[in-house]
Amino acid sequence: MGKIIGIDLGTTNSCVAIMEGNQVKVIENSEGARTTPSIIAYMDDNEVLVGAPAKRQSVTNPKNTLFAVKRLIGRRFEEKEVQKDIGLMPYAIIKADNGDAWVEAHGEKLAPPQVSAEVLRKMKKTAEDYLGEPVTEAVITVPAYFNDSQRQATKDAGRIAGLEVKRIINEPTAAALAFGLDKAEKGDRKIAVYDLGGGTFDVSIIEIADVDGEMQFEVLSTNGDTFLGGEDFDQRIIDYIIGEFKKEQGVDLSKDVLALQRLKEAAEKAKIELSSSQQTEINLPYITADASGPKHLNLKVTRAKLEALVEDLVERTIEPCRTAIKDAGVKVSDIDDVILVGGQTRMPKVQEKVKEFFGKEPRRDVNPDEAVAVGAAIQGQVLSGDRKDVLLLDVTPLSLGIETLGGVMTKMINKNTTIPTKHAQVYSTADDNQGAVTIKVFQGEREMAAGNKLLGEFNLEGIPPAPRGVPQIEVTFDIDANGILHVGAKDKATGKENKITIKANSGLSEAEIEKMVKDAEANAAEDHKLRELAESRNQGDALVHSTKKALTEYGDKLEAGEKEKIEAALKELEDVLKNASSDKAAIDAKVEAVATASQKLGEKMYADMQAQQAGAAGAAGAAAEGASAQGGAQPPDDVVDADFKEVKKD
């Protein structure tokens, strides 16, 4: 069997590594570099350039040179982050037929996984050239905060590149593997991995434990921002240069794609230089021209100026750190080591901020560009069975659930649950004789489904006619070791089932995730109220249904006045339920009124049952008491009413 290679598919740079025995080897590409720019150029003669050659020609071919495509992978075109990038990128970002964000080169529409596959293909070839044999299997890394569709899209990119993706592994976890196996320290320790890359930011709290000679890496929590990275730092410098040039020369460079490409290159170079120097000079002759002739750009930028430009970006990384510490159930003082991953962590201001938050110097003995690929290669060796002394326990970054009656988000799997994991729950129908149900799958932390991200939906049809609450529909959530979700629904009576893997039909952006989490905290009280209101409405609906049914069967045994009293109370309850602005107190009062008015009806039902089932008086009495208290029969305890709709056949 061939080797399983480890690939760090980065926003800005990518890297490939393999294990040789217990030694790791980061492989140099055909240009002799250990990292490859994640840049792809589509040439006039249909040639595709990847890496340094693509980067070198980008200034003369800006519209067909694609970079930072990872920021678009698994995302919808409408997302505000995608819309923001449209105005910044020299290449075209377009809307695909399915609503995804795609790109365009030479008039050809390209899906982000298709473009990323070119980089993966280069990584595959780099490994094959070194090993002298074909490579077909890989472990590919993704940001820990990547959602389901982004992971699926990354897996698709691997398949397009001719690789069987044995595992999708989180970048901070991979870096922890590289760090843990490289160090001789014994005993349990907790580490924080602060990963600020080209396009994404992640922080994970990981416990490394020695269990019977086996190193166990357990992720305690993860958090992050999938739209924050070195590209944003570069953009701040570009915006600053454009502003200064406009003040001096009166020319707006933001409309000139050729100039923008040169500015991007210069901004990245200046940023890197300012990590070791206090000042740098950006010198771009013939940057543009107007009626008066050519214009030259010459600008001095100090480290202090750069730090002022990006201060809020650095600050944005701290809140996820705070959340990760809280979710892990640890204190900052419990962290033994802080690992920095990603090229952007070389910036002194970033290191200073990390030291300030964690109260200790971050480790400098981990290569921020290579650690992730090294960890992926180690995981590849574990999966191939060549390494038995490592156990990796990763987590899912966000809660997953389905929408149930009243628009409530019923969580099936909570965030930071160790994966792989599986959870099943029995639900029922909301209407009599409902022939089909629609299962809507959501991801997020809000109590109401509308506040979360809809990942996908599917139908389970052919449910035999039955009263509401009788059919038993088992919904199963299964997250595999790649963090990819599989959902199934099964009618327990007929055995009919339907399963889906959530496909990359929608992208869950970090801004949305952060908004969900922050909103969930800020609006916890409001969410709780909405949930209670939904529960009161559900109780009211159930009571109307069961009381009407009881009236049909036993109403003729009541005096006319009693029956009218119940019908009047029912009418008032129905009116208050129909009114969208009714609050919980109003609904509860009418529910109580119906329950009180129905006491005589309950007694008649009780007497009738006693007469019919004299032999089973005890059992019948218990059932009738339940009916009089609740206004009707209730489904079993383990059955939750779900807000399913009937799917009409054309």
Swiss-Prot record:
<keyword id="KW-0067">ATP-binding</keyword>
<dbReference type="InterPro" id="IPR018181">
    <property type="entry name" value="Heat_shock_70_CS"/>
</dbReference>
<feature type="region of interest" description="Disordered">
    <location>
        <begin position="611"/>
        <end position="650"/>
    </location>
</feature>
<keyword id="KW-0346">Stress response</keyword>
<keyword id="KW-0143">Chaperone</keyword>
<dbReference type="GO" id="GO:0140662">
    <property type="term" value="F:ATP-dependent protein folding chaperone"/>
</dbReference>
<dbReference type="GO" id="GO:0005524">
    <property type="term" value="F:ATP binding"/>
</dbReference>
<feature type="modified residue" description="Phosphothreonine; by autocatalysis">
    <location>
        <position position="200"/>
    </location>
</feature>
<keyword id="KW-0597">Phosphoprotein</keyword>
<dbReference type="InterPro" id="IPR029047">
    <property type="entry name" value="HSP70_peptide-bd_sf"/>
</dbReference>
<dbReference type="InterPro" id="IPR043129">
    <property type="entry name" value="ATPase_NBD"/>
</dbReference>
<dbReference type="InterPro" id="IPR029048">
    <property type="entry name" value="HSP70_C_sf"/>
</dbReference>
<keyword id="KW-0547">Nucleotide-binding</keyword>
<dbReference type="GO" id="GO:0051082">
    <property type="term" value="F:unfolded protein binding"/>
</dbReference>
<dbReference type="InterPro" id="IPR013126">
    <property type="entry name" value="Hsp_70_fam"/>
</dbReference>
<feature type="compositionally biased region" description="Low complexity">
    <location>
        <begin position="611"/>
        <end position="634"/>
    </location>
</feature>
<comment type="function">
    <text>Acts as a chaperone.</text>
</comment>
<protein>
    <recommendedName>
        <fullName>Chaperone protein DnaK</fullName>
    </recommendedName>
</protein>
<dbReference type="Pfam" id="PF00012">
    <property type="entry name" value="HSP70"/>
</dbReference>
<comment type="similarity">
    <text>Belongs to the heat shock protein 70 family.</text>
</comment>
<dbReference type="InterPro" id="IPR012725">
    <property type="entry name" value="Chaperone_DnaK"/>
</dbReference>
